[in-house]
């Protein structure tokens, strides 16, 4: 009953604010932007835009496309070749680039507003992208209506919406200020894809040059049981040592 009241209130708030407006949604394929896209597409005309860069994995793109088709979302994929500088402000620089692209799309196709899936909890975390959001006047309905991550997960589960594993860009696998090439990104992307043969959920391969650190949210024994093949694969890619982070990676 509490869930139903919360959902009805959220839908009414979205309808009141966005009815008859054309909306571009910054769509990453994560649960926040996915749920927002589903709810807004029931109310008005929407265009979900996924921006594919060399540091966004093909796995993330494919998942985003699959869910867009599953929930009948109007999706546009924009591919760019630029790799932002791997500096402490990389998240801000990335979001700034993304929001600039989305704003140009809004103006080009006469949409009224650009929104993203920022939720209420995000406002209280250290998120450099929030500064870029403010600079481009990007709307955040979940944050505006005080909908946090727990609310989003609850609504998604109750509506039987598939909850994708939490993904971050491939640049987060590297330490700040290290110069990153296309080859570096491809190496990590291919190794994470290789590990999906053994485990489910979120996977991270941290690159410390000669050392690779594997993080997963699935059962660690699935990696340990296949260690010989995994070690060989990683050494084929140039790593001298392969370690497992014993602390389970948590998506949510």
Swiss-Prot record:
Disulfide bond sites: none
GO terms for MF: sulfurtransferase activity
Entry similarity comment: Belongs to the LarE family.
InterPro entries: LarE (IPR005232), Ni-pincer_cofactor_biosynth (IPR052188), Rossmann-like_a/b/a_fold (IPR014729)
Transmembrane segments: none
CDD domains per the UniProt record, alphabetical: LarE-like (cd01990)
Protein name: Uncharacterized protein MJ0830
Residues spanning the signal sequence: none
The organism of origin for this protein: Methanocaldococcus jannaschii (strain ATCC 43067 / DSM 2661 / JAL-1 / JCM 10045 / NBRC 100440) (Methanococcus jannaschii)
């Amino acid at each position: 009953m509490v869930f139903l009241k919360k959902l009805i209130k959220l839908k009414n708030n979205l309808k009141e604010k966005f009815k008859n407006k054309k909306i571009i949604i910054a769509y990453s394929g994560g649960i926040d932007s996915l749920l927002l896209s589903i709810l807004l597409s029931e109310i008005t005309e929407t265009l979900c835009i996924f921006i594919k860069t060399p540091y966004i994995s093909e796995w993330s793109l494919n998942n985003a496309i699959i869910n867009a088709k599953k929930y009948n979302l109007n999706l546009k994929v924009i591919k760019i070749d630029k790799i932002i500088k791997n500096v402490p402000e990389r998240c801000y620089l990335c979001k700034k680039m993304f929001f600039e692209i989305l704003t140009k799309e809004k103006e080009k196709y006469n949409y009224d507003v650009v929104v993203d899936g920022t939720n209420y909890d995000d406002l209280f975390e250290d998120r450099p992208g929030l500064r870029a959001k403010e600079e481009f006047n990007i709307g955040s309905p979940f944050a505006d209506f005080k909908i946090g991550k727990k609310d989003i997960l609850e609504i998604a589960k109750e509506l039987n919406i598939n909850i994708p594993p939490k993904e971050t860009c491939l640049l987060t696998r590297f330490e700040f200020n290290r110069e990153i090439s296309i080859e570096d990104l491809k190496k990590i992307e291919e190794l994470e894809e290789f590990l999906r043969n053994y485990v489910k959920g979120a996977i991270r391969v941290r690159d410390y040059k000669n050392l690779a650190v594997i993080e997963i949210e699935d059962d660690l024994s699935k990696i340990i049981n296949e260690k010989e093949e995994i070690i060989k694969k990683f050494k084929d890619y140039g790593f001298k040592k392969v370690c497992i982070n014993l602390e389970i990676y948590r998506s949510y």
